[in-house]
Amino acid sequence: MSDFKSIPGGICAPKGFSAAGVHCGIRHNHSKLDLALIKADVRCAGAGCYTTNKVYGAPITVDREHLKDGYAQAIVVNSGNANTCAPNGVQLAKDTCDIVAKELGIRADDVLPSSTGVIGQAMSIEPFAKGIPEAAAKLAADEAGSHDAATAIMTTDTHPKEIALEFAVGGKAVRIGAIAKGSGMIHPNMATMLLFMTTDAKVAPAALQKALSTVVPATFNQISVDGDTSTNDTVLLLASGLSGAEIAEGTPDYDTFVAALTEVAEHLSRELAGDGEGATKLLECTVTGAPDLATARAVSKSVIHSTLFKAAMFGADANWGRVLCAIGYTPGDFDISKTSVRLKSKAGEVFVCENAAYHAYSEDEAAVVLKEDEIDILVDLGSGDATAKAWGCDLTYDYVKINGDYRT
């Protein structure tokens, strides 16, 4: 992180971007913003990654179509309705793009729509027709604009999620900004996770897509809150090029750019996992000693996905057998008998399992460690050099309450 400087501004920090959030009427609570608009001053190189669910939101169909040429200039996002499994969904998403294009004076196929909320609900164009002109009038290239947009895309999130950082390329300052939402239905390949990133680096569309496709599997696809892969998972990245710093694939500058994207993605992955519905603790599982990267990723995600282990973490119970169980049912060519497990927080560390067997520890000390709000699960498979991380949260009574009342 020493080469990457944290700065204010969120998604509006890079040159050439403005954002806004308004209440347009999709959500019944008038105090909640439910429409976000992000605009670039110029046509941008664009990249996207989406849900692997066979059922996917209508906006994703439109995004894929609009990004075929590798360029876009605006993103419009609503919360409160997923626009998924609606008979007029695709046409409504296209009509939304038409309204944005008219208000901003850009091409309709340069607009990328996105939605989050309840699946299978009727949706009309009226809230968009009302809200998009209001959002266009409110566009601001500052921290407030980013914050309003980040707030407008929230559903059961408890707080907005934003980040921006700056780094140097060829003596020029390059910035990356991002906003995200996601609290439940998070088990990506990608959560509903929506994440929008901007940069003022000059990157060709193909190189930008490759960079995003490199970062997503190592970060956002390593989050699990509840094991449900959403229908609307979307990550979009726009590059304005207005910093003047050109980044070409296969160069050290490109590697730096990917590292910066990874820094942003890891930060937001932790934010998303820690804000899981009803969560009281962020869980981070680091696997070392794996025979290959795929195994390292699979094992780390298996651990933080285990319902039994997540419940144990809520109760501050060092039930390491549940960790070993989750490792054991994970595919991969490794010798389980070489596995060790440690549990760590700012309160200390306990070594609970060595060579897949009990390692003497104090239950009282373990309880102190596990009462903290961030817990590290350190797994060494002893079978190679590969490593990976995954992020999740504990499973609480409130998760059931939130999802039992979601549509009421």
Stretches found by the model and what they are:
Residues 2-91, 95, 101-408:
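A structural signal for small-residue-enriched, beta-sheet-centric alpha/beta enzyme cores
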